[in-house]
Amino acid sequence: MERALNLIKETLSKTFINLLKTEVSNLYLVGGALRDAYYGIPLKDFDFVVSKSDLEGIRDFLKERKISHFSLNEERFLLLRANSNNFTFDFMILDDSIEKDANKRDFTMNALYYDVKSDKSIFKGEFLNDLKNRVLSVVNDDSIKLDPIRSLRGIRLACDLSLSIETSTKKFICEGVSLLKNVSKERVREEVKKILHSDFKELVEILKSLFGQDLTGFLPRFNLIEKMDLLDKEVNKDVSFKDLCKISVLVKYFNFFLTWFTGREMQYIEKMVNLKIENNFDSLFEAFFNNTREMRIPLCAIATSFDLRDVLKAFSLFDKWSKIKIDTNAIKKSGLNKREFGAKKKKLLKIECKKVYEEI
């Protein structure tokens, strides 16, 4: 732990914290930074707890030095950001004492404290042992019940840090996911997005250990999806078709992944899940033609249902088909009505697509 503390002290000494600590009555670093420093993960976020009387003084300190900051909750939570070095500093009011504050934390490895002013670490021995042994364990039996979002955070931490989950904590996480319906969609969304960017091999192992559902057979498929550049297009600014493609597999087994989508994203996922495509020309062409405005919907359906050796072929087909241009001038001159015109154009497109299909 000494190496981790030295890294933290060295990092903080280069920030405004080095001066701030001389102007407050107490300043305790807690949680993720200590954990990440111990595991050798680059430091980005620093969470502090301070006395209520110091909180306003910290705000004034930042204003005077023109350090970018804002308040998420005037009474309880103040988020401060130092733009000079891209670190995020969170300041929260200490809950009476370190012991009481620690008891309200989520997991033991996040309930380790460092007293910045006195340069002393404060933590229970068993909490430090969990960190050293890479064991995810709740601080107390009500930790996840108090805030069900911690169930997803636990899954993510276990994935990202290759943690084993303590037996009773597994039970609490499983119970917690059933309570996510009571959590704001925005908070769930943030955690699920992070989970989607975790190592899927680790995620599959964690989900198996928690819920008994073995998705190991999907790993080659997930790896293939990651390589599909055609699925990189964003549905929203923070979610891509690649993300929805993965989710369309996960939701078949884990309902709690359904709690975070926007209406538009749900429509896409439902189409992906319900679209049935067979591996023959007629079925592929109909899926392509009926989804020309959003070709990625059938591509996602293909990526999650076809044999892996046929997925690449289908993706190549759709890519080539999308580049085919049909000269409609002659059709327009034939005097066909709108319905007849559409049927004729489809027929000509199908002929050209069939040629490409037979060449591959």
Q: What are the language-model segments listed below?
A:
Residues M1-I360:
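Catalytic cores of the polymerase beta-like nucleotidyltransferase superfamily
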